[in-house]
Amino acid sequence: MKLTILGAGAWGTALASHAATAAADHDVVLWGRDPAQLAGIAATGVNATYLPGVSLSPRLVCEPDFDRAVDHALTDPEGLLIIGTPVSGLREMTRRLAARRKGPLAMLWLCKGFEAETHAMPHQMVHDELNALGVAPGEIEYGVLTGPSFAKEVAQGLPCALTVAGTAHVLIDRAQAAFHHHAMRIYGSDDLIGVEVGGAVKNVLAIATGASDGLGLGLNARAALITRGLAEMTRLGLALGGRVETFMGLAGMGDLILTATGDLSRNRKVGQQLAGGKTLDQILADLGHVAEGVRCAQAVAALAARVGVEMPITRAVCAVLFEGLPVADAVSQLLQRDARDE
């Protein structure tokens, strides 16, 4: 099975390494925008920029030429293309892949969030681009691979379980053939809306939980934020067309728990450091990586307003990030909300 992962960040690299190790017949290529970075990975077996100190599969092949990397997967009728860029790069990648295809194409993306300008979900962005290009339904099957997963742990071969949701079951079958090996479990879903809402909203809620922990508010407060945050996520997802069971699964509750409590979470770190008095600009400069919760917080709040869903925790995060509200004041406002039924 031939696979191409487009994007040599932490998650793209980790997944490529796992796939290369997963089965003897897997032929995996990793492409990235920086040829020097790819050369370093090929020479040392380590992605020193995003996964320092973690040894990658020796069977992983780095390919700096985009067309050759894409053609690698396209030459296999059972091949799979994985887009490992942030949400902001998804439209461009979709256009480039559609232009390169020679027949049916199967692709997945790894990004989580909503588009900042349009508030579109990733699958809506892809659908719009393919429709504008005149691609007929079924010519390109697409979907998302998501769930509770830190890239470093995946690259280290530690156990995890993920969800793949797509436009056709053949895509789920290919994703399971590619990744459902050794320590990784892949579960299928047809609820693209639900899994994408879960993947976006959990990042915003992780900022809130990190801020609570940064203020030293305790484990009770953490549990309350996660639980009430899950309620916010579910309300929004149902209003947008998702299914309730999705939010009780890996792409909802599972990803929220991991991102809100795990110390490898960039979004959690943002909240902790905001509580510690750092400015958002300082925090993002220090991180050096994408924190999707910051990027999509306003989009989540705008979507909620559009469909009439109340999301007080999300609104508080936006006020802290973009309106200068001190973290302690945001907590105070949440605690002063009127009593209500759960």
Swiss-Prot record:
Role according to the record: Catalyzes the reduction of the glycolytic intermediate dihydroxyacetone phosphate (DHAP) to sn-glycerol 3-phosphate (G3P), the key precursor for phospholipid synthesis.
Active-site residues annotated for this sequence: K202
Top-level taxon of the source organism: Bacteria
SUPFAM superfamilies: 6-phosphogluconate dehydrogenase C-terminal domain-like, NAD(P)-binding Rossmann-fold domains
Chain positions recorded as NADPH binding sites: W11, R33, K112, A151, R266, V290, E292
EC numbers, comma separated: 1.1.1.94
Protein name, as recorded: Glycerol-3-phosphate dehydrogenase [NAD(P)+]
HAMAP family to which the protein is assigned, alphabetical: NAD_Glyc3P_dehydrog
Pathway where it operates: Membrane lipid metabolism; glycerophospholipid metabolism
Species of origin: Cupriavidus metallidurans (strain ATCC 43123 / DSM 2839 / NBRC 102507 / CH34)
UniProt cross-references to PROSITE patterns, sorted A to Z: NAD_G3PDH
Location (main, coarse): cytoplasm
Annotated compartments: Cytoplasm
InterPro entries xrefs: 6-PGluconate_DH-like_C_sf, 6PGD_dom2, G3P_DH_NAD-dep, G3P_DH_NAD-dep_C, G3P_DH_NAD-dep_N, NAD(P)-bd_dom_sf
Enzyme class (EC, first level): oxidoreductase
Biological processes annotated in GO: carbohydrate metabolic process; glycerol-3-phosphate biosynthetic process; glycerol-3-phosphate catabolic process; glycerophospholipid metabolic process; phospholipid biosynthetic process
Binding site for sn-glycerol 3-phosphate: K112, G147, S149, K202, D255, S265, R266, N267
Catalytic activity reported: sn-glycerol 3-phosphate + NAD(+) = dihydroxyacetone phosphate + NADH + H(+); sn-glycerol 3-phosphate + NADP(+) = dihydroxyacetone phosphate + NADPH + H(+)
One Gene Ontology molecular-function label: glycerol-3-phosphate dehydrogenase [NAD(P)+] activity
Keyword NAD: yes
